[in-house]
Amino acid sequence: MLSFWEQQTYLEYDFIVVGAGIMGCSVAYELRLKYPKARIVVLERGLFPTGASTKNAGFACFGSPTEMISDFKLHGTQKALDIISNRYEGLKILIARLGSDNIGLTPLGGYELMFSNPLSKAELEALNETLMPYFKSTVFLDISSDMDKFGFKNVQQLLFCPLESQIDSGKMMQHYWNLLQLNNIQILTGAEVKNIQGNLVEIVNTIGGTVTLKSDCITLCTNAFINEIMTDVPVKPGRGQVIITSEIERLPFKGSFHFDEGYYYFRNVGKRVLFGGGRNLDFQTETSTKFEFNKLIVNDLKV
């Protein structure tokens, strides 16, 4: 049962945003910029962001060369370019909004390892020419001549992107939440949305009670989890598996690395290596929102 004061204070809003990850925080902040006096609340079912915002590898990236070439074929060149450009512009907004230090930005660049079928000079030049109108600079460089200092084996080609960086995903989300609260945006954790009917949002809180909130504008920013609220939305999750090593003395590389069309990726975290990917080994199982290991993929990553 809610008290008189709780009913007066917590039940009605101008805007309700469901999901307090990167997307939810970004939407809420943009709403604040447009509507300075609006009552805005962000609902998060966990104690901190439940989804990929704090469970990713911490790459500030927008696509490796082979991933882009694959996307050109899959989506069409212009649509793929729009996606790539939006990723890059979004990263710039994130950095400007939160500050480099507050997201742990480390501009070490991004790399792609080619174990077979290296890109020809003409293919790389064509890709850079296609990207030039969006980035205004050369995006990818062939640095295969420097490959030995990285300590990689069986790599035929090494491509470098100076525009990519590493970030600290936990630190980033902590500061995004701080930014919302400084701008009078309320975040309610332990608030799992069970149902939406018109302008009413039914949530279950961590102590087992059911509360109904009201707003004329409700935005769902739960991404992979959206089908738990709206079953008719054609969105499938793409879960990822990530492992991390113990410390490795004299680790020969630093930066963000991809291979196999971006399906595999790794980076240094201090002296440790965070390694993830392999979703292409088991697409069906990885269309899941369960937080559990996929033994097939994890064993492949360990090898």
Per-region residue spans from a language model:
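Flavin (FAD/FMN) cofactor-binding and adjacent substrate-gating region
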Residues: 66-72, 96-178, 182-183
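Helical element adjacent to the flavin cofactor pocket in flavoenzyme catalytic cores
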Residues: 154-217, 221
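Active-site lid/adjacent beta-loop-alpha segment flanking the redox-cofactor pocket in flavoenzymes
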Residues: 251-303
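Extreme N-terminal leader/targeting segments of oxidoreductases
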Residues: 1-15, 33-34, 38
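Glycine-rich FAD pyrophosphate-binding loop
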Residues: 32-55
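Glycine-rich active-site loop/strand segments that organize a redox cofactor
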Residues: 51, 55-86
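Glycine-rich Rossmann-fold phosphate-binding loop(s) that bind the pyrophosphate
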Residues: 19-25, 45
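Central helical "cap/lid" subdomain
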Residues: 205-253
